Structure formats: structure tokens, C-alpha cells
Amino acid sequence: DSGELAHPLAGVPMAVKDLISTKGVRTTCASKMLENYVPVFDATVVQKLDAIGAVCLGKTNMDEFAMGSSTESSYFGVTRNPWDASRVPGGSSGGSAAAVAAREVFYALGSDTGGSIRQPASFCGVTGIKPTYGAVSRYGLLAYASSLDQIGPLTIDARDAAAVTAALMGRDEMDATSVDAPAPALPEKTRLDGLRVGIPQAYFGDGLDEQVRARVMDAAHELEALGATLVAVDMPILRYAIPAYYILACAEASSNLSRYDGVKYGFRPAHFEDLHDLYLTARSEGFGAEVKRRIMLGAFALSSGYYDAYYNKALRVKALIKRGFDACFEKADILLTPAAPTTAYPLGAHADDPIQMYLGDIYTVSVNMAGL
């Protein structure tokens, strides 16, 4: 009625990962602990999309508290890959990736702490962006690791990803880590003359599936055909990324998840003897196995006897990883890497081998640690 043009995303069906607060709508983090939690406010990203007329169809499944890479640890059951129902969609934003791949929505919001947007996007054949840390407000995101978490979109293609990311970005007074950053814009030209594409050698070593290697190099040669120059770069510090990441992320998780104690909100057992028993029972029954595993790992790393030996060393590795990326970007404008060592694997393949699942994050966690 005002005569103004509607936003390009107005009326477009979308979905929201179930750890992003939605006023009046359950936000469970796929956990028994928050099975009946209903926020009284919207996350900033939800407010922004609501203001431009986006249509939210619902919340998407995920690994419990975003701790996983397969969306198999959800209290509400697994999500299957829409291309092959016997395989995982990736995680932890597997529900968002699957919803977009199945064309149930045009885009969905996810979160990425160590690859949780990029890996499921790869497994489901969609486009995922982890925005630079601080470019998108985290207000209303139920935290896993606050220094690493970032909200971003999963979409059908790159142009949609740019449009949604632009709508989400901007400084927010409710998030002190947020900043004003230039919104992404895809050029109309198809030539890439002058663009230097870095190929980090450390990302193409042992453990990378040959099919994945071939497809990434196919993409590299396509970029080269459009005028880009391929440049070999290296990041030897990458081999320390996984242990450092899991020390830091789990340490932050052990602190962030300490708020779920059965007293203020969340799961509360029907019977308990005293306050200590309430804490013990609420957390034992409210958290799943993987969440408890990571809380214990984080608490161990922060304990007085191991703080310097593990946590402080992991912080030093984090700083070295950032320097490694800085060195790469002196030679290249962008880096081309795999998102995961393999394609989507069968459901249950890593159920009894959490270390193997952790190693699947090798190509993604370093970006979060560098704040890129």
C-alpha cells in the first residue's frame, strides 16, 4: 500500500535451526534438557528476517547443542540425507541443510562453530556460508562456544546465499562482538582475471577421499579457465587444529552449559534428594552422551592441574593458525579447500567412534579459530 518495493526475501519460505531463539516457539537445541523451553524474545537474526517479511515454516533438527557432525545425536531422532536416506546429512546444522536440499524451504539458518554450516552443505549439495566472526549478531543464539559460534545461511545457490547473508549482517547493540561489515555482492561478470586462488597443500594430504580431491581440483581448474591464477600455499600448523579446537570449544561449552542445572529453566527431574542430587540428576538425564563427553573434556582442560598444559597451549595454537592464514592471504585472494574429508557417510558409521567424527572437522575448524 505504501508503494515501496518489497524486499527480495519478502514472502520467501525459510526455516531456523533449533538453537536460535524464536519468541513463543519452542527452541530445544535438540535436547531433553530444553525439550519444553519457549523463549520470550526473538534472536536478532529472526527479528531482521521478520522485518523484511520472511515466512518461517518451522525449526530444523540438529545435533544436540550443536555438538556433532551428523545430526544423529538429536534427542528427537536422526535426520536423513534427502539424496540418500541411508546416509547422514552432516551436522550440526543437518536439518537446515536437508530442508534446503529437499526444497522444503528456499533457505534456512544454521550455526557454525567448527564447520556446522559448511560440512552439511557439502553433504547435501547446497550452499552454506559461515560469515566472518562478528559480521552477524549472535544475540539469541544458544551458545556452544561463544568465541567460535557464528550464525549463517544454507541456500540453494551462491546468489541466494549472498542475499540472505546481506539481510543478516550488521552491528547489533545486543552483541558486543558484532561489527558493521560490507555486505556481500556477487559481480555480474563471469571472468576472474587477476584473482589469485590459493590451494593449501596441507588440505590435500593423507585422509582425503580421492573423489573429494578430484571434485575440488575440478573446481580449481574451472576457476582457472575463467581467468583465475592457482597459487600453491601451505599451512603446516593445520595438523594441530583439531586437538586445539576441541580443547577450546569444549572448555567454553563446559562453562556455557553450566547454566542448565534444573533450577532456573530446562529439564527438572520429578524426584531428587537435595540440591546436589538435583544438579546431578538433571544433567545426567537431560544431556545426551556426546554433550556430557564434551563437557567433561572441557572441564578437564580447565582444571587447575591442566590449564597451562592444555588450554593455554591451545590458545597459542589458535594464534598461530591466524598467522598462518595471514601468510596465505599475502599470496592469495581466496583459498579453495575441501569442506570434509569424505562425502556423506552411512547412518551409524561413526556411532561408536567419536574420534573419527572429530577428525572429520579437520578442514573447517581452523577458519573458526582464525575468526575468518
PLM region spans:
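Gly/Ser-rich catalytic/binding loops embedded in alpha/beta enzyme cores
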Residues: D1-T113, M217-H221, A225-L226
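Flexible, low-complexity linker/loop segments at domain and module junctions
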Residues: S2-V12, A183-V197, K331-A332, L336
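Glycine-rich, small-residue loops and helix-cap segments
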Residues: G11, A51, V55, V105, ...
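Short, well-ordered beta-strand elements within core beta-sheets of diverse protein domains
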Residues: A15, M33-V38, D149-I156, G298-S304
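Glycine/threonine-rich flexible loop motifs
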Residues: T27-N36, D209-E210, Y345-Q356
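Short, solvent-exposed turn/loop segments enriched in Gly/Ser/Thr/Pro and often Arg
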Residues: T60-G68, I237-A241, A340
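Glycine/threonine-rich beta-strand-loop-alpha-helix active-site module
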Residues: T71, S111-Y139
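A short helix-breaking turn/cap at a secondary-structure junction
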Residues: T127-A219, L275-T281
